[in-house]
């Protein structure tokens, strides 16, 4: 439809879809109020939407949330952010799903590692997984049947070093 009023909103580098949705809801309420007031005063002119710039998103299925570690760290990080909170990005480990709630981009990599390999899995250092172009740190995760938790805490009593996430 036609556009009456627009506002821009920056997306933060580590912001999840859920966090962005909350900020958009607050902004949307303000913009709606402003739009109705300005429309009532006759201050707005409808501008036709450019159909070439309009985009559509298909239905997001659970399988869309599966992480492919042969992709770049940035692509994986953005997938995790975009799938949080629902349906939640995941990978498989030992035939079981592992929900990955948050990640952090790393500046260094491990060229000898294979994609999906848990290169560092230490309760003090964290969980670092090999990607197509380096490493990504998993900072918050959830094993099947367990609660969502900080990755370092989740690694207590678990030895994932050398394991593969698929």
Predicted feature locations:
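An anion-binding loop in the catalytic cleft
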Residues: 64, 69-166
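Active-site-proximal loop/hinge segments within enzyme catalytic domains
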Residues: 1-106
């Amino acid at each position: 439809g036609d556009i009456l009023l627009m506002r821009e909103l920056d997306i933060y580098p580590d912001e999840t879809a859920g966090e962005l949705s909350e900020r958009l809801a607050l902004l949307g309420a303000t913009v709606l109020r402003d739009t109705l007031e300005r429309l009532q005063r006759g201050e707005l002119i409808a501008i036709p939407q450019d159909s070439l710039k309009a985009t559509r998103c298909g239905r997001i299925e659970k399988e869309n949330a599966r992480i492919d570690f042969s992709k770049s760290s940035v692509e994986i990080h953005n997938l995790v952010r975009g799938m949080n909170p629902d349906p939640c990005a995941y990978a498989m480990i030992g035939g079981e799903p592992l929900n990955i709630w948050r990640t952090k981009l790393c500046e260094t990599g491990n060229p000898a590692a294979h994609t999906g390999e848990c290169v560092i899995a230490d309760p003090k250092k964290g969980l670092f997984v090999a990607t197509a172009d380096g490493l990504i740190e998993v900072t918050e995760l959830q094993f099947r049947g367990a609660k969502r938790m900080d990755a370092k805490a989740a690694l207590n009593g678990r030895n994932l070093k050398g394991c593969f996430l698929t």
